Design a protein with these regions (language model features):
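Hydrophobic helical membrane-anchoring modules
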Residues: 2-33, 182, 207-279
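Conserved donor nucleotide-binding strand/loop of the catalytic core
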Residues: 66-69, 80-114
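Conserved sequence signature across two-component system core domains
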Residues: 42, 71-73, 98
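Acceptor/aglycone-binding surface of glycosyltransferases and processive sugar-polymer synthases
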Residues: 96-114, 119-122, 128-211, 232-252, ...
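Cell-envelope/extracellular polymer assembly enzymes that use nucleotide-activated donors
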Residues: 35-37, 67
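A conserved acidic beta->alpha catalytic loop
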Residues: 72-81, 127
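Short, well-formed alpha-helical segments that are part of the catalytic scaffolds
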Residues: 45-60
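Donor nucleotide-sugar binding loop of glycosyltransferases
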Residues: 45-48, 75, 104, 130
Length: 279
């Protein structure tokens, strides 16, 4: 059984994809396009891999054909080995590897580039986003009656299982962002989101852009839906972020996104077909 995998210089490029165990491209094969892809960014999450992948598979099997794209953001522990060890049990599992750490937005971007499905869902690799929420996120986008311009379904956490300091800082940041960007989102930091792949790839790409998906999708004329999702403590290890570090970066990001929204020029177009007429 082969695992689909590739090692990519950061940022990843889609033409690096091969179907192979580890990094080689021997035994390449073409598989049918799945209905949706689940992107899981990971950095030093060795202890969480097995449980999280198993939960994703259990949640997604009733929904449709899918692939799981784990993006290893240059982990220094055994995350890669833990993913490779699951290859025989989960043929839908793929592995993308950064050659140097790029952060969560870079990992999401690489995963979406590598994904083959038209609909993409993402969740954090630390296990705090319970995978049983995935069908709720995917349902509106996979429905036969889905609105044509529905581009993003964003999760909003209910009953967050974080420290008091983290919850308070997040609440302040969300209120400030909502006031400035007017994106109608209560919890833009939630890692559970589902979206159209083509819509995502047309967004401006920058570090930390995953925190501003509702505003960015709306900027491009897409409809955004929100659903409540559950939350739980990390499965293992500690957070890779600090409240102070996130706040300092967030100020600059917020200013930049506000500038992007103001500078957006949108116009509707339609092609007029010209037919040849006889002289």
């Amino acid at each position: 059984m082969f695992m689909q995998a590739f090692r990519a210089p950061f940022p990843a490029t889609s033409n690096n994809v091969c179907s192979a165990h580890a990094d080689g491209c021997d035994g390449a094969s073409v598989k049918p396009i799945p209905d949706f892809a689940v992107i899981v960014p990971m950095h030093n999450e060795e202890a969480s891999v097995g449980t999280l992948v198993g939960e994703i598979v259990a949640a997604c099997r009733p929904v449709g054909d899918f692939e799981i794209v784990v993006v290893d953001d240059a982990s220094s522990d055994g995350t890669v080995g833990a993913v490779l060890s699951l290859a025989d049990d989960y043929p839908m599992l793929r592995l993308v590897r950064h050659d140097r750490q790029g952060g969560q937005s870079a990992a999401i971007h690489s995963g979406v580039q590598a994904a083959r499905a038209p609909i993409v869902c993402m969740l954090d690799g630390d296990g705090q986003n319970p995978p049983d929420n995935l069908p709720t996120l995917l349902g509106p986008l996979l429905s036969a009656t889905a609105p044509q311009r529905l581009g993003l379904v964003a999760g909003q956490r209910v009953g967050r299982r974080d420290t008091l300091a983290k919850r308070l800082s997040s609440r302040f940041a969300n209120q400030l962002r909502a006031r400035i960007l007017k994106d109608g989102t209560r919890d833009t930091g939630c890692g559970l989101k589902a979206f159209r792949r083509d819509a995502y790839l047309a967004l401006p790409y920058f570090d930390h852009h995953h925190r501003y998906f509702p505003a960015l999708f709306s900027r491009d004329g897409w409809q955004v839906a929100h659903v409540d999702v559950t939350h739980r403590p990390r499965l293992h290890g500690n957070s890779h972020y600090t409240n102070i570090g996130r706040a300092l970066v967030g100020i600059y990001d917020l200013i930049g996104v506000a500038w992007l929204l103001r500078r957006r020029k949108r116009s509707n177009w339609a092609e007029t077909f010209i037919t040849e007429t006889s002289p």
